[in-house]
Amino acid sequence: MNVDDTAVMIRDMTIRGAGRIARAGASALSDFAGSYEGRDMRAFRKDIEKAKKKILGSRPTAVSLWNGVHATLRGVEEAKDVGDAVSMIQKNAEEFIANSTRAVELIGRIGSKRIEDGDVIMTHCNSSAALSVIKTAYDQGKHIKVYATESRPWRQGILTVNDLGKAGIDTTMIVDSAVRTVMTEVDRVFVGADTITSHGAVINKIWTSQLALAAYEARVQFYVCSETYKFSPMTLSGDTVAIEERSYEEIVKKGEIPDSVKVYNPVFDVTPAKYVDAIITELGVMSTGSVYDVLIRQLGGKIFQTEE
């Protein structure tokens, strides 16, 4: 798929989910490079930079997209010629997509060990990583029940309950505001993440923080399922995560309320680290305090690069 179409599909939520948009961005840049017909390296660098900015501009909050794009373009500045750069981009993209897919599988295996037979689980939005944990536990023969939130305004919970229902899992969809009411029946909560800061705060679909607070109040374990490429290197240097806001038309129809009334429609919220029991990653189960260590010592420049 070309860069323009990919950017539009990410922006209009046709492609959604932090991991999915990261893989889509990597794939689009690979296709762009593969179809490039020019031979001038300076022009190629300029064009690939434009393509990169289009992709990154489609979803400003998700660091997964940023890391996926930069992993795909890693080393291009040192390429000898266009052919070398194209080969490098295609190889990087293939590697990133394979590692991203593999990470979800590993998270499923690791996280499923935290689920016991008979558990009642709650999840929010539509996280591939969280679903991997839940479905892996079910495939292991554990009898579980799942409460999945509707996740307004885009109702990503519809995708989640369809996935779980087709797998044969006992699933109930609840309205977002029923989270606190239902939490007394829940044993564990599993959610995904769009971005995790260096100090362990979790940026995810709006209402995640309320769900975490309800779990904390009820003393229910709250797990974040996240690939490590969703850890934000920019927050190491003090940058904050921009919270994307979307159109009021996702909430109300034009003319439904007076023009003088404002509508605030943030896509994400921030869950403080203290409400997170553990982060389940492809590297293992870790505390929120371990995010800094992973960014600095284990991943380093292999995936993350500093924007100049």
Predicted feature locations:
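Short, hydrophobic/aliphatic alpha-helical segments
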Residues: 1-12, 113, 252-260
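Long amphipathic alpha-helical segments
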Residues: 1-87
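Gly/Ser/Thr-rich loops at beta-strand to alpha-helix junctions
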Residues: 18-20, 121, 125-130, 153
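Ligand-binding beta-strand-loop-alpha-helix segment within the catalytic cores
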Residues: 67-117, 142-189
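Conserved phosphate- and dinucleotide-binding cores of soluble alpha/beta proteins
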Residues: 149-308
